[in-house]
Amino acid sequence: MVMGDTPSLDEIRKAQRADGPAGILAIGTANPANYVIQAEYPDYYFRITNSEHMTDLKEKFKRMCDKSTIRKRHMHVTEEFLKENPNMCAYMAPSLDARQDIVVVEVPKLGKEAAVKAIKEWGQPKSKITHLVFCTTSGVDMPGADYQLTKLLGLRPSVKRLMMYQQGCFAGGTVLRLAKDLAENNRGARVLVVCSEITAVTFRGPSDTHLDSLVGQALFSDGAAALIVGSDPDTSVGEKPIFEMVSAAQTILPDSDGAIDGHLREVGLTFHLLKDVPGLISKNIEKSLDEAFKPLGISDWNSLFWIAHPGGPAILDQVEIKLGLKEEKMRATRHVMREYGNMSSACVLFILDEMRKKSAKDGVATTGEGLEWGVLFGFGPGLTVETVVLHSVPL
């Protein structure tokens, strides 16, 4: 072969890249069958943790649960299991092995349930999946949950895997940002994205000196969500985007060190809230919006559809006030919070699913509540904020 026939690096690079933006081609969700009703949870929680003598603390916990706006939460861990593992019911007792035994098995399993639904909606053979991004804050293992899911689904051994452990609640935005870069930089790539979260790693009894831990016990829940992400959808086989991803950014908020911490210890994953998280987020959120939407000439935040990680109702309330958002902007977000609780990284993907389903049911013009442009926010330890600009698709 003569040198002149060899393509230039520029030509090779161009051929490797996709032409269009990354799109979300399918969404699937899954939850454990077991669930708790939030109004009944304080009685159950203080009984199962042998803490009924802590009457003042129980009243505080009741108020937390009442204010949470949550109706029900799915949880893999049942009363029977907790009775057999009393160390998990103490505030600080060595219990990591018992927790790991659950999550190492159940995190990939719940992820599989969501992935099977997403693959079915996508309608293509799973052999077309080129990349897998798996995210969980529940446990760690080698080989990881990404490997286990590859085996459970029967994906090709050559699928390119990325395992994200211990990121926390912002990571639903992170996986979208990564999937976008993978899909747009690898022509024909189809990325399976899975977030699977199980609270077996964080469940613990109450402590009257650590109310921040109780906040987590009032909010956290189990769930998994899966997406197929790809650029240049093949309409001849029925591929069609639900949303397109236009840009994605990540930032650490100023003066927020230690606002949310999680530490994996012998006692499981401990959770600490040390600062005014709703205040820090609401104070800084407009800067992220300006940076994301100035290039598009958009400055009316009510003209966007909204998908925000529902860390807790106070975060949503303060963001609404700070930005002057109409009440209906957070409808999909609040619906997921009410029906599922805070499923960490999986939440924003559940909200995407809720929004496209409700938009279709209501007969509006687009997958984004009839609007063209939208924003997805992930908030979590750091404080880290993920901002994804979304473009809806006509229905």
Swiss-Prot record:
GO biological process assignments: flavonoid biosynthetic process; polyketide biosynthetic process
InterPro entries for this protein: Chalcone/stilbene_synt_C (IPR012328), Chalcone/stilbene_synt_N (IPR001099), Chalcone/stilbene_synthase_AS (IPR018088), Polyketide_synthase_type-III (IPR011141), Thiolase-like (IPR016039)
Active site positions: C169
Pathway terms, separated by semicolons: Secondary metabolite biosynthesis; flavonoid biosynthesis
UniProt entry keywords in alphabetical sequence: Acetylation, Acyltransferase, Flavonoid biosynthesis, Transferase
Superkingdom field: Eukaryota
EC numbers, comma separated: 2.3.1.74
Cited Pfam families: Chal_sti_synt_C (PF02797), Chal_sti_synt_N (PF00195)
Catalytic reactions on record: (E)-4-coumaroyl-CoA + 3 malonyl-CoA + 3 H(+) = 2',4,4',6'-tetrahydroxychalcone + 3 CO2 + 4 CoA
Record PTM N-acetylvaline, positions in chain: V2
GO molecular function, one term: naringenin-chalcone synthase activity
SUPFAM superfamilies tied to this protein: Thiolase-like (SSF53901)
Record function comment: The primary product of this enzyme is 4,2',4',6'-tetrahydroxychalcone (also termed naringenin-chalcone or chalcone) which can under specific conditions spontaneously isomerize into naringenin.
Family under the similarity heading: Belongs to the thiolase-like superfamily. Chalcone/stilbene synthases family.
Protein name as it appears in the record: Chalcone synthase
Species of the source: Cardamine amara (Large bitter-cress)
